[in-house]
């Protein structure tokens, strides 16, 4: 029995879990210095670090971890008209959460990089199948049978997917489209599943909205506007989600929980 976890969420400030001291790192262990002031960047700090080769990763302490292990990932969304009244659309929902575990050298998507065709389809149409195919192309860096696809979820609401992983695949990438929207989505990219040589037991990551950079639409129901030049994936700031042009809005949280 792993003990009692008390998960805390303070919107737009900090998210994390109080974990028994003998097991499981906290959110602060997962993230790196410099993210504390911007909760929207939690879960992405690792992507800014130089990647190790697969050979270097094989020598890392993670290989001493017990495996396989099982996790549940819950997408809890609370995007609503009361908190985000500007142009709020009918039928607010999120597409099926899609993604899976992988090794350090693999990227399903990454902030600051151009969206792949698979991410474009997920962000614009909520279609997880191209993403599944892109994931499978990762070879030994992924676990093809563990690519998970959840259910469409109305907002507010929640959906949960499950996956298993091992000591060679200790990162997680998942996405879900905010809909209706031009090309907006939520998710994490290369979120570490370990810290300090231990599997993460439970953690909550704030979810803000990312713009895939593949459509120039500025509101939920905007007509398709193909950009002259695709833009890198970036946080969506200002309207219609936030009244502050410099602020991204939190619309949910991703809760990761180890189940065995």
Predicted features, each with a name:
Residues 1-4:
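Positively charged n-region of N-terminal signal peptides that target proteins for export
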Residues 12, 33-35, 203:
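Disulfide-bonded cysteine motifs in exported proteins
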Residues 18-20:
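Bacterial signal peptide processing site
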Residues 43-47, 52-56, 60-70, 78-186:
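Structured domain cores in non-transmembrane regions
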Residues 137-260:
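Mature, soluble, non-transmembrane domains
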Residues 14-16:
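C-terminal motif of bacterial Sec signal peptides marking the signal peptidase cleavage site
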Residues 22-35:
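Ser/Thr-rich, Pro/Gly/Ala-heavy low-complexity intrinsically disordered linkers and tails
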């Amino acid at each position: 029995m792993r003990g009692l976890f008390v998960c805390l969420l303070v919107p737009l400030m900090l998210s994390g879990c109080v974990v028994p001291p003998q097991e499981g790192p906290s959110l602060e262990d997962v993230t790196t210095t410099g993210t504390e002031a911007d909760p929207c960047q939690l879960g992405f700090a690792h992507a800014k670090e130089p990647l190790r080769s697969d050979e270097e990763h094989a020598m890392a302490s993670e290989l001493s971890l017990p495996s396989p292990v099982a996790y549940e990932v819950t997408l809890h969304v609370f995007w609503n008209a009361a908190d985000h009244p500007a142009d709020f659309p009918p039928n607010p929902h999120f597409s099926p959460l899609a993604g899976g575990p992988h090794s350090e050298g693999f990227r399903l998507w990454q902030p600051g990089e151009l969206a792949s065709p698979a991410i474009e389809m997920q962000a614009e149409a909520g279609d997880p199948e191209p993403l599944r195919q892109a994931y499978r192309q990762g070879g030994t860096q992924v676990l093809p049978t563990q690519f998970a696809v959840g259910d469409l979820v109305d907002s507010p609401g929640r959906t949960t997917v499950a996956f298993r992983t091992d000591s060679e695949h200790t990162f997680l990438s998942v996405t879900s489209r905010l809909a209706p929207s031009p090309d907006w989505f939520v998710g994490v990219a290369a979120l570490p599943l370990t810290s300090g040589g231990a599997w993460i037991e439970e953690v909550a990551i704030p979810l803000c909205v990312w713009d895939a950079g593949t459509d120039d639409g500025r509101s939920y129901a905007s007509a398709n506007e193909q950009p002259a030049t695709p833009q890198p994936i970036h946080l969506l700031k200002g309207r219609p989600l936030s009244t502050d042009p410099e602020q991204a809005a939190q619309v949910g949280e991703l809760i990761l929980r180890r189940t065995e």
